[in-house]
C-alpha cells in the first residue's frame, strides 16, 4: 500500500491555488501497483491494473480522471474474398473538459478492463473489451469486429462500435457506440471489397471500399499524467484480396494483406485489427484489443 499526504498552502509553483481546491490534511492511499505522478500543482496515479484508491482525513476536491475501457477484438476470415473487421476502441470517460468531482472519505475500487480476444474462427465475432471503472464511473469496453460468416458479420456495439466484416458480395454493418457517447460507430464493410474499421474516441471507423480496407477511427493524445499517451483508436479493417490496407492510430491494431490482424496496444483501449483474406481456406485471425487505463489526479 502506498501513502501520499496532501498538505499544501495557497500557492504552488507560482500559481495561486483557489481555497476550494486546497486538500489540506487529506490522505490518499492505494493498493495494487499504480504509478504515481506529479504535474504542475497536481498529483495522482495511473492504474494499468486493478487496485483501490483510498481517501481519508477529509473530502478530496478538484478530482479529474480519464478512464478507458478495453478495446474490442478484431474479426476473422478464411478465404481470399473475405475479410474480418477492426475492433472498436474502448469507451473513454473524462472530466478534464468539464467540472471536477469530489471523493468522500472511503475506498474506491479501480478496475482496468482487459482487451477483447480477436476471433480465431469465421463463425464468431471478435470479443468485446471489458469495462474499466473508478467506483461507479464506467468506461464501456469496445465492440468486437465482425467476421465473414453471415450470422456474425455485423460489428458489435460497445464503447466504440466494431467494424463490419465481408464475405464476397455480402458485407456487414458497423457496430453502434454506447449512449451517452464514449466513442464512435464502426465502419461498414464493402460488398466485393474490404472490411470496416473499428470506431475510435474522436472519429468513426472508416467504411471499407472496393480498393481499400477501412481505417480505424482516431483516438486522442494526452499528457494527463506527464507521459504522452495516444489512446482510444479503433482497429483497421481486414483486406479483401488485392485491396490496399487501412491504417490504425492511437493504439489500434493495423492490418497486412493475407495475415492475422495486429493487436491493439496495451493500456490504450485500442481495437484489434481484422484478419485479411487468403486463398486455400486458411483462417486469418483478428488481433486482440488493447487493455484499458485509469488515470486520476487532484490539486495539492
Could you say what each language-model-derived stretch is?
Residues 2-300:
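Low-complexity, glycine/proline-biased repetitive segments and flexible coils/loops
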Amino acid at each position: 500500500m502506498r501513502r501520499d499526504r496532501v498538505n499544501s498552502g495557497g500557492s504552488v509553483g507560482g500559481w495561486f491555488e483557489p481555497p476550494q481546491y486546497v486538500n489540506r490534511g487529506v490522505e490518499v492511499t492505494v493498493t495494487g501497483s499504480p504509478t504515481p505522478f506529479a504535474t504542475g500543482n497536481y498529483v495522482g496515479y495511473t492504474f494499468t491494473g486493478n487496485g483501490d484508491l483510498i481517501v481519508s482525513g477529509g473530502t478530496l476536491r478538484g478530482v479529474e480522471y480519464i478512464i478507458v475501457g478495453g478495446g474490442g477484438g478484431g474479426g476473422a476470415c478464411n478465404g481470399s474474398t473475405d475479410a474480418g473487421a477492426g475492433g472498436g476502441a474502448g469507451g473513454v470517460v473524462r472530466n478534464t473538459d468539464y467540472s471536477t468531482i469530489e471523493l468522500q472519505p472511503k475506498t474506491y475500487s479501480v478496475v482496468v478492463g482487459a482487451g477483447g480476444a480477436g476471433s480465431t474462427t469465421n463463425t464468431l465475432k471478435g470479443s468485446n473489451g471489458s469495462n474499466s471503472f473508478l467506483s461507479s464511473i464506467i468506461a464501456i469496453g469496445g465492440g468486437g469486429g465482425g467476421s465473414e460468416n453471415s450470422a456474425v458479420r455485423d460489428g458489435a456495439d460497445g464503447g466504440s462500435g466494431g467494424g463490419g466484416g465481408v464475405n464476397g458480395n455480402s458485407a456487414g454493418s458497423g457496430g453502434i457506440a454506447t449512449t451517452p457517447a464514449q466513442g464512435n460507430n464502426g465502419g461498414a464493410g464493402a460488398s466485393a471489397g474490404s472490411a470496416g474499421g473499428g470506431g475510435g474516441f474522436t472519429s468513426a471507423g472508416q467504411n471499407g471500399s472496393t480498393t481499400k480496407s477501412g481505417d480505424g477511427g482516431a483516438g486522442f493524445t494526452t499528457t494527463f499524467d506527464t507521459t504522452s499517451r495516444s489512446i482510444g483508436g479503433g482497429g483497421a479493417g481486414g483486406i479483401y484480396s488485392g485491396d490496399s490496407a487501412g491504417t490504425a492510430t492511437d493504439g489500434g491494431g493495423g492490418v497486412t494483406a493475407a495475415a492475422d490482424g495486429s493487436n491493439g496496444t496495451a493500456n490504450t483501449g485500442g481495437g484489434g485489427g481484422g484478419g485479411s483474406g487468403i486463398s486455400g481456406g486458411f483462417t486469418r485471425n483478428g488481433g486482440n484489443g488493447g487493455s484499458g487505463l485509469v488515470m486520476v489526479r487532484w490539486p495539492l
